Amino acid sequence: MPNDFIISQLPSNKILLEGKEYDFYSGTAYLGMNQDADFKRLLIEGMNCYGMSFGSSRNGNLQLDIYDQAEEKMAHWVGAEKALTVSSGMMAGQVVAQYLKTQNSTFFYAPSSHSANFHEPNVGLPNVSFEAWASNICEEISEKNAPHSVIVCNSCDAIKLSPYHFDWTSTLPQNQSITLIIDDSHGLGITGKNGSGILKQITVNENVRLIVVSSLHKAMGIAGGVVFADNDFIDKLRHTAFFASCSPIAPAYLYAYMHADAIYKKNQQKLKDNIQRFSSQLSDSQTLFNSIENYPVYYSLRDELYDFLFQKGIFIYSFAYPIKTGKPNTRIVLSSWHTSSQIDYLIDKVKEFCKVAEV
């Protein structure tokens, strides 16, 4: 069965394919912000105030106040000294990687590191588990003894849902210059206290500079990206030609963000409720999925689950990523926009699949 489709509407908790309606469990809109009516109203208010886009340099001689305001709020939220917003998660990774590339840096990439953070177009990634990589990285850094080591990893495995632990970050060599970059694109907004993500959970020694980069387009529903770091590093990025030549996030999104605390809180709670409702009813079906506690994604090795659920009016994630020719990644992605009745129907059909497939 083909699983590639083209539609002419933005997905929400349902999509229309060839005249038939399907419950939609894919994508990365974990908090459903891109279809939230209250957030849309704030976005329109922002457009009325700041226009639809701002194609000028952030280093020009006329600045909009909303950028500094939003960045200060984001930094306080996640526990960083400073934040810098850019036009995408890819740009957030690249503004950091391309600067560090000029600093006599040696890069060490964890398995499955996102290409947004590559300092070169093609980077070879370790073909081991994150756990195995983490158990050796401290020794590898110590033995290499590079002038400046840059470690790059994701905050979580959002594809296959293997758990990531970060106790190793506090045991990195203390006699070397080290930068640790963590991509929190699939955590920011839905993990950590009040959705603040990974940064507060990481412990490093004084010689290790901690940087968190993230897309804002996923849980947060903001078409942009962000870098969290210390004051000195963010100031350095601000004055690079790379940053100066980039158009910023459309300011209307940051206006909406500044006024959306209650909306985020409401949708975070709804997502938690949906995760609890789904997970608590899995029981004997637990072996079908890899999952992380309190995380809205469920990965299955049983790719035939996609076809089965599709026949039942449920559309789930099933495609190879990041390389199209690879094995499909079959996943169920929950969002705050799903209703209780949708979750119950999904559970019922998952249990039905388990019986048929003898899981």
Predicted regions and their residues:
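Conserved PLP-binding catalytic core of the aspartate aminotransferase-like
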Residues: 272-313, 336
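Structural motif of enzymes handling amino- and sulfur-group chemistry
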Residues: 232-233, 247-270, 274-279, 283
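Conserved PLP-anchoring active-site segment centered on the Schiff-base-forming lysine
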Residues: 96-117, 134, 138-140, 271
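Active-site phosphate-binding strand-loop segment of PLP-dependent enzymes
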Residues: 130-182
